[in-house]
């Protein structure tokens, strides 16, 4: 690694530690030529996951979209911001663990509903009504019936 002060290419690592979120390693280095210290960060290279939408267009996965959808579904319900962020984080990790470059928006929606059902059933029905595009009250009743049976 080149020293930012003198461009010498050799250095030694003086200190190394993980950042708070454990996704990056912070290293303090000392140049073997000028003896000045500098900080570098080492991180695993992320490959963006593309979401394939119903109309077959693709866009980058965005955890914030999940959070925003959950905030709307959970409005005036006993669901904390932390619970919402935890759901979004778990879904993001699940997608990342699949090691895929593309995922269908349908799959993400199902993952959200599975998690939301465990947290708050009313929020689940709200989310499902928009996600599954309920057309009438009978569709609502059918979903609630399935929720009660399971």
Curated annotation (Swiss-Prot):
Gene Ontology BP, a term: negative regulation of DNA-templated transcription
A Pfam family hit: ATP-cone
Residue stretches making up the ATP-cone domain: 49-139
Keyword terms of this UniProt record: ATP-binding, DNA-binding, Metal-binding, Nucleotide-binding, Repressor, Transcription, Transcription regulation, Zinc, Zinc-finger
Cofactor: Zn(2+)
Zn finger (unnamed) location: 3-34
GO MF annotations, alphabetized: ATP binding; DNA binding; zinc ion binding
Cofactor notes: Binds 1 zinc ion.
Keyword Lipid metabolism attributed: no
PROSITE patterns on file: ATP_CONE
Family to which the UniProt record says this protein belongs: Belongs to the NrdR family.
Function: Negatively regulates transcription of bacterial ribonucleotide reductase nrd genes and operons by binding to NrdR-boxes.
HAMAP family: NrdR (MF_00440)
Cited PANTHER family: TRANSCRIPTIONAL REPRESSOR NRDR
Name under which the protein is recorded: Transcriptional repressor NrdR
Organism of provenance: Clostridium botulinum (strain Alaska E43 / Type E3)
């Amino acid at each position: 690694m080149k020293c930012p002060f003198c461009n010498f290419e050799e250095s030694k690592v003086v200190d190394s530690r993980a950042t708070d979120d454990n996704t990056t390693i912070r290293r303090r280095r000392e140049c073997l030529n000028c003896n000045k210290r500098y900080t570098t960060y080492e991180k695993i290279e992320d490959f963006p996951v593309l979401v394939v939408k119903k109309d077959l267009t693709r866009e980058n996965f965005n955890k914030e979209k999940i959070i925003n959808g959950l905030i709307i579904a959970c409005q005036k319900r006993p669901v904390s911001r932390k619970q919402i962020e935890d759901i979004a984080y778990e879904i993001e990790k699940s997608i990342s663990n699949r090691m895929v470059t593309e995922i269908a928006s349908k799959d993400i929606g199902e993952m959200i509903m599975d998690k939301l059902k465990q947290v708050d059933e009313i929020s689940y029905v709200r989310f499902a009504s928009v996600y599954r595009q309920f057309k009438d009250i009978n569709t609502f009743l059918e979903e609630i019936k399935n929720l009660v049976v399971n």
